[in-house]
């Protein structure tokens, strides 16, 4: 099995709204954390939540952290789509897929997937309708099924694991609507005993 797995997310769009806030850790380190919701089209029909957990002002070498500075501008200016529509601030974010592990009220472990933000930059180009929220990741797939949907057409669902930078196994399931993609996984017939390691995007 590979030692380095791909797991990348790229998002461009308008700052729709956010819960970003300046905070201080118990050890006295200033940082910014919270959720930045990004509208990936001019009509804000698709909004992607991006989670920034711990963004500090400088890197280990002492250089300023441009992502911290940009998130600070978003907090200070609050130039959001909710307030200003399509004239709102635009951003470009790179990150990865991660799982938010927690215990439910019933005592069961839940691991919903989410986007973890790594770097954020101002975006000056127009926001296109297609291609503003993309991901590519290696995935160890243990199952595939076709789901019937009379309203929107049948779709496929794969379940398995993606990997973070520590190569931890992160359980995820993904929806597939592309017919060729559905055909590929149906023919591959991945199972727990005979999984499929492949790249998905």
Segments and roles (model prediction):
Residues 1-201:
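OB-fold and OB-like single-stranded nucleic-acid-recognition modules
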């Amino acid at each position: 099995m590979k030692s380095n797995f791909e797991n990348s997310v790229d998002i461009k769009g308008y700052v729709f709204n956010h819960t970003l806030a300046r905070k201080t850790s118990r050890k006295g380190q200033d940082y910014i954390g919270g959720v930045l919701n990004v509208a990936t089209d001019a009509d804000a029909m698709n909004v992607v939540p991006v989670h920034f957990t711990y963004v500090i002002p400088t890197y280990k070498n002492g250089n300023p952290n441009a992502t911290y500075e940009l998130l600070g501008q978003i907090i200070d200016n609050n130039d959001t789509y909710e307030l200003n529509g399509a004239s709102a601030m635009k951003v470009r974010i790179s990150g990865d897929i991660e799982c938010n592990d927690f215990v439910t009220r019933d005592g069961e472990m839940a691991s919903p997937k989410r986007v973890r933000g790594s770097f954020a930059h101002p975006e000056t180009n127009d926001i296109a309708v297609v291609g503003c929220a993309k991901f590519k990741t290696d995935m160890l797939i243990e199952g595939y099924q076709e789901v019937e949907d009379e309203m929107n057409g049948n779709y496929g669902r794969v379940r398995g694991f993606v990997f973070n930078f520590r190569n931890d196994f992160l359980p995820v399931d993904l929806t597939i609507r592309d017919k060729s993609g559905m055909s590929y996984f149906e023919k591959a017939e991945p199972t727990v005993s005979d999984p499929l390691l492949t790249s998905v995007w």
